[in-house]
Amino acid sequence: LVGRDTIARMSRVAMGTHYDGTLMIPTRFALGYMKSMDNRWLSGTDSASCLLSESAFGHVGAGGSIGFACPETCMSLGYTMNQMGLGLLLNERGQSLVDAAYKALGYRSNAGGVWDN
């Protein structure tokens, strides 16, 4: 459905901000898709993060939902909940599902802001 060249372009960061005027946090995007964003170093609600592998791309939704693809593992994951959480980005519950998927695939750590194998 989607060629390798297009997947490669979808995986590359096309834009990063120190402050996104809509989300009010630092963000990273690739052709309209969100990339891994590590804002754990910020305090309070500004610490909203979405920790994926470097090649992964997708988007979070209000209340904690997420959908993404990870070309290097041939994995895709979608999560919606029956009760919205607080905030605009991925919440702890959603991130824990992402973390479990990467750990099951043998990835070791997301300490550097992206899942690393």
Feature names for model-found ranges:
Residues L1-N117:
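Catalytic loop of the DD-peptidase/beta-lactamase superfamily, centered on the K-T-G motif
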